[in-house]
Amino acid sequence: MNPQWWMFIPIAFLAGSVPFGFLIGRLNGIDIRTVGSGNIGATNLGRALGKRFFYACFFLDMTKGLMPTLIAGHFMGTLGTMRVEAPDAFWWLGVMLATVLGHIFTPWLGFKGGKGVATGMGAMIGVMPAMTLPAAGGLVVFLVVLSLWRYVSLASSAAAASLPMWTWLVFSQYHTLMTRQASTRTDWEHLPAEQIELIKGEIPNYGMPFFVVSLMLAILVIYKHRGNLGRIMVGTEPQIGDRGSAPEAISPMPPTADTE
């Protein structure tokens, strides 16, 4: 483990803490915390100001998650490989979590931020390729659930719940692929070290840190959506496209404890 990892954690937290939804709202004359559900995330901003503001906020939130993990992985030499030793993997994933926690507990708004969906997606994409592929799988789940039920919160929760499964699947397929490639080779002196380890049965479980952290992230995101899921059950949660018809989308109300 490289001790320089520690310096990326506070940088990632500060990057994640930039409240783009709040800032965009201020620039357009509203305090997003007093509009609709009180969420500072892209969904509530889109309901209040329109689709283009949703896309702008989502892109910015995703980018602030992407850049810290991408830069940290580049400088620490973990970017672009599945074979990351556990200590370095946990530090890299710590950078990923720091961006999400910065978004959820932004110090600039009294430690009350969003739910971390867009920021988490960007941060996962930056952990290439180990978490990029699970993020893609989660995106597929998000789009399918959204198209069927039209609840952003339900789609986000379903995508988060699928992340540990996708992470396990990606690493199990990686292990199988490397084993098959190694079993067909006889020129061991030209084999990569990880393939020799596979043949000897000595390869570490590289996927375990990623699985553990993906499970933690899934639990965190679902917990942050507990209020939305409760409103879905009683039929009061707005669906996508309800900007004009959903009362919470057009009338100011006090901010709720549940933020996006």
Task: Name each model feature, range by range.
Residues 31-42, 107-121, 151-162:
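Short, non-helical or kinked segments that cap or interrupt transmembrane helices
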Residues 22-54, 113, 230-260:
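Cytosolic, membrane-interface loops and tails of multi-pass inner-membrane proteins
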Residues 47-73:
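Multi-pass membrane catalytic core of lipid/isoprenoid biosynthesis enzymes
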Residues 13-15, 22, 56, 100-111, ...:
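Transmembrane alpha-helix interface/packing and boundary motifs in multi-pass membrane proteins
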Residues 1-28:
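N-terminal signal-anchor transmembrane alpha helix
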Residues 133-138, 152-160, 203-214:
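Loop-to-transmembrane alpha-helix initiation sites
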Residues 83, 172-204:
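Membrane-interfacial helical/loop segments at transmembrane boundaries in membrane proteins
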Residues 46-51, 72-76, 98, 117-149, ...:
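Interfacial segments of multi-pass membrane proteins
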